[in-house]
Regions:
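Nucleotide-state-sensitive switch-loop elements of NTP-binding domains
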Residues: 2-11, 16, 20-136
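Short amphipathic alpha-helical segments and helix-helix/interface helices
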Residues: 26, 96, 143-144, 167-168
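Structured helix-beta-strand junction loops
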Residues: 32, 149-150
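A short, aliphatic-rich alpha-helical micro-motif
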Residues: 87, 144-147
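G-domain G4 guanine-recognition motif of GTPases
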Residues: 97, 127-132, 150-168
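Charged helix-capping and loop-helix junction motifs
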Residues: 138-142
Length: 168
């Protein structure tokens, strides 16, 4: 029986670097562990999934396309996650919701039956595009709410900013 799988939600706006972070994490995966990655694509074409999918020992991928994971009572998500967990029997689970989704609603679903005994939710990780924020891009209300709840905020893409923008 599967239980207490460390589960990491890696969220943020479109283009913030979620898929790149997951690729970097996968490169650091201990050889003896099995990991699973569930990716949500808002559209029907799974670009992020295509970027991640490759033959990698001990890593299983699944994708839920066509809307955010928490919508439509989460039925596609529930099915996709259930199938992934049964197939992969992972030691760790990474979930990348769409940058257009509602990650806090997804976390609420994961805290409910049947997942509460199966998954050990870790504090969410939120990536933000520092260059976009410095240029005046605004976070949606759901992104602002996640930023307040995140265990780790990563300001990505800051290398193009001058020192004043990075520190101020």
């Amino acid at each position: 029986m599967l239980n207490d799988i460390p589960t990491h939600l890696i969220a943020g706006p479109l283009g913030a670097g979620k898929t790149s972070l997951i690729r970097a994490l996968l490169a650091q995966k201990p050889a003896g562990e099995r990991w699973a990655v569930l990716i949500n694509e808002f559209g029907q074409i799974g670009l992020d999934a295509a970027l991640l999918h490759r033959d990698e020992a001990g890593v299983s991928f699944a994708e839920v396309a066509g809307g955010c994971l928490c919508c439509v009572n989460g039925v596609p998500f529930q099915i996709g996650l259930s199938q992934l967990l049964r197939k992969a029997r992972p030691d760790r689970l990474l979930i990348e919701p769409s940058g257009l989704g509602h990650p806090l609603e997804l976390l609420q679903q994961l805290r409910q039956p049947p997942w509460q005994q199966v998954l050990a939710l870790q504090a969410p990780v939120m990536l933000l595009d520092a260059t976009a924020l410095a240029g005046g891009a605004a976070l949606t209300p759901s992104q602002q709410a996640l930023a307040a709840e995140a265990g780790l905020l990563v300001l990505n893409k800051s290398e193009g900013l001058d020192e004043a923008a990075r520190t101020g």
